[in-house]
């Protein structure tokens, strides 16, 4: 009996030793995970719908992951290539859908605008009828006649005139880009370029995380849908955020949001920025402000058809600040416009600032890879300081 008791105690002793070793391993792994977690910079991309948030994420993949070779930059080249091929095939369909939506939206708007727009060539009416007839066809297979009709309509001066009034209806930003490329997109062996993939518009629904590394520093970037019904999901991402990148479509000063076809898009962005800046959960989180779509803003300002003061009367009294630094060769009208928009946001951050968080504005063009590379490099020091402050190391 005594021997049996000692044997049992030995078993217990071995079991306890094994348990202690297992606990040590778990504790070591937890400490390692904690170190990795604390060393990771978590960036939350916020902004109103169609401001360019998802395009910023795509640029991070081009610059810091592995381009569009799979979601996570796989180490296995074959797996990466397989993912890349599958993703690009999906994107071809998305690009074709963008092209179809663009021509449908423009020709459908022609009769609805006040005053309406007529075709320059009335013989193209049968082409309009065709485009409208396939508008709601599910799983559309893009036959050759679709491209033929779309191209002929895009070359019609009446359709172009309707496109010029696109601020009066809801049209995706990439409409002209893909309509100009009909002959390329229609090819059976068409493979999208990085620029095509950057321009492609797909509505973001839910929360998407992109992980990348820059100079051995880990970044997690969270892209959240910007439409009003998506914003209730944002609160899920607020915990342990290093910084917020707030993206604004600067060119949207003469447009209205899709959700109600009434609210000015830039005013919506200003209201949203104010609510985030004053949010009690975010009072210590600084905001990097991406004043995006500078290329489209410049086009609108120089075209002179939609004046900012018609939508924001205070612009008439605005003068370009002395510390403004225009881009080389930039028209003074463009400089004045972009700094006015910048200062509208800075008025919000300075009016309610308590010194616990700051706003860092940058002028961006999300489809320009070099611009985003330069801006993100400029932001890295800011993000690093925020991260050190977050863990009270600064």
UniProtKB/Swiss-Prot annotation:
Name the record gives this protein: Guanine nucleotide-binding protein G(s) subunit alpha
Stretches the record annotates as Disordered: 1-23, 68-90
Stretches for region G1 motif: 42-55
Lipidated residues (S-palmitoyl cysteine): 3
Role of this protein: Guanine nucleotide-binding proteins (G proteins) function as transducers in numerous signaling pathways controlled by G protein-coupled receptors (GPCRs). Signaling involves the activation of adenylyl cyclases, resulting in increased levels of the signaling molecule cAMP. GNAS functions downstream of several GPCRs, including beta-adrenergic receptors. Stimulates the Ras signaling pathway via RAPGEF2.
Lipid bilayer topology: Lipid-anchor
Taxonomic lineage of the native organism: Eukaryota, Metazoa, Chordata, Craniata, Vertebrata
S-S bonds: none
Keywords: Cell membrane, GTP-binding, Lipoprotein, Magnesium, Membrane, Metal-binding, Nucleotide-binding, Palmitate, Transducer
InterPro entries: Gprotein_alpha_S (IPR000367), Gprotein_alpha_su (IPR001019), GproteinA_insert (IPR011025), P-loop_NTPase (IPR027417)
Lipid-bearing positions (N-palmitoyl glycine): 2
Region (G2 motif): 196-204
Residues binding GTP: 47-55, 197-204, 223-227, 292-295, 366
Source domain of life: Eukaryota
């Amino acid at each position: 009996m005594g021997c049996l008791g000692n044997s049992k105690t030995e078993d217990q002793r071995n079991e306890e030793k094994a348990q202690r070793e297992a606990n040590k391993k778990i504790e070591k792994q937890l400490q390692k995970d904690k170190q990795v977690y604390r060393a990771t910079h978590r960036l939350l991309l916020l902004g109103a719908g169609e401001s360019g948030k998802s395009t910023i994420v795509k640029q991070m993949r081009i610059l810091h992951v592995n381009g569009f070779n799979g979601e996570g930059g796989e180490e296995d080249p074959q797996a990466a290539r397989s993912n890349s091929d599958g993703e690009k095939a999906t994107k071809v369909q998305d690009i074709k859908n963008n092209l179809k939506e663009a021509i449908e939206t423009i020709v459908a708007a022609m009769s609805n605008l006040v005053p309406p727009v007529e075709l320059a060539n009335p013989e193209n009416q049968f082409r309009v009828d065709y485009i409208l007839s396939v508008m709601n066809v599910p799983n559309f297979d893009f036959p050759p006649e679709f491209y033929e009709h779309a191209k002929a309509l895009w070359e019609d001066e009446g359709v172009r005139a309707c496109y010029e009034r696109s601020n009066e209806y809801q049209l995706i930003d990439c409409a002209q880009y893909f309509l100009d490329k009909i002959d390329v997109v229609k090819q059976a062996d068409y493979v999208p370029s990085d620029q095509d993939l950057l321009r492609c518009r797909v509505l973001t629904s839910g929360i998407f995380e992109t992980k990348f590394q820059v100079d051995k520093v880990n970044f997690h970037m969270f892209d959240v849908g910007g439409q009003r019904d998506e914003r209730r999901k944002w609160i899920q991402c607020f915990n342990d955020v290093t910084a917020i990148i707030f993206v604004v479509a600067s060119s949207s000063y003469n447009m209205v949001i899709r959700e109600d076809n009434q609210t000015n898009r830039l005013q919506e962005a200003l209201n949203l920025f104010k609510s985030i800046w004053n949010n009690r959960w975010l009072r210590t989180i600084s905001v990097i402000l991406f004043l995006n779509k500078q290329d489209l803003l410049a086009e609108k300002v120089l075209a002179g058809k939609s004046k900012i003061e018609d939508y924001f009367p205070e612009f008439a009294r605005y003068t370009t600040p002395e510390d403004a630094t225009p881009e080389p060769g930039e028209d003074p009208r463009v400089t004045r416009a972009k700094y006015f928009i910048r200062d509208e946001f800075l008025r919000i951050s300075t009016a309610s600032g308590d010194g616990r968080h700051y706003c860092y504005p940058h002028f961006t063009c999300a489809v320009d890879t070099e611009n985003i590379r330069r801006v993100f490099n400029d932001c890295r020091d800011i993000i690093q300081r925020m991260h050190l402050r977050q863990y009270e190391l600064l």
